[in-house]
Amino acid sequence: MTDAPPTTGLHHVTNVCTDMSETRAFYEDVLGWHTVKRTQNYDDPGTPHYYFSPTPAGEPGTNVTYFEYPHGRGQPGPGASHHFAVGVEDEATLQEWRDHLQAHDVRVSDVKDRTYFKSIYFSDPDGLVFELATTGPGFDVDEAAPGSDVIDPYDQGYAGDGDDDGDDGGGH
């Protein structure tokens, strides 16, 4: 451990989209999230900055925010985010989400077994990869102390099929 001051966890995550109305429709109509704040980028006045949350009040730690840059395109690689994961209670809920996403014409992966949890993957309108992951049994039962074991997914038969880039229904 270090002598770093404590933190309380993630406050929010900010991404970039090319069309805020399309992003807002995705969060509200497909994911069922709430638009909890509409403002502008404080460092780039005039650039829309929206906050979305699965909770009506948008408590810290639940917000995903977006800046709108219509002509901006990121690329995968160092310094870029690969995906972000949102928890669901159990495998039944994960399957409900898979069915729900397919009903909204969202390409979604099969359920992936990730040793500690199970997941599905899909992308938003700009290609940002989402993961929905079960909460258990997971981290509290697999090791004596968190981070004490190294799991090799190839040795244990959990490795992906290489179809995990998010643009074709895969995504990790």
Named regions from a protein language model:
Residues 11-12, 49, 59-62, 83, ...:
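Histidine-centered active-site/metal-ligand motif
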Residues 15-61:
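Core segments of cupin and vicinal oxygen chelate
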Residues 22, 31, 36, 63-64, ...:
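Catalytic cores of nucleotide-enabled group-transfer and carboxylate-activating enzymes in metabolic
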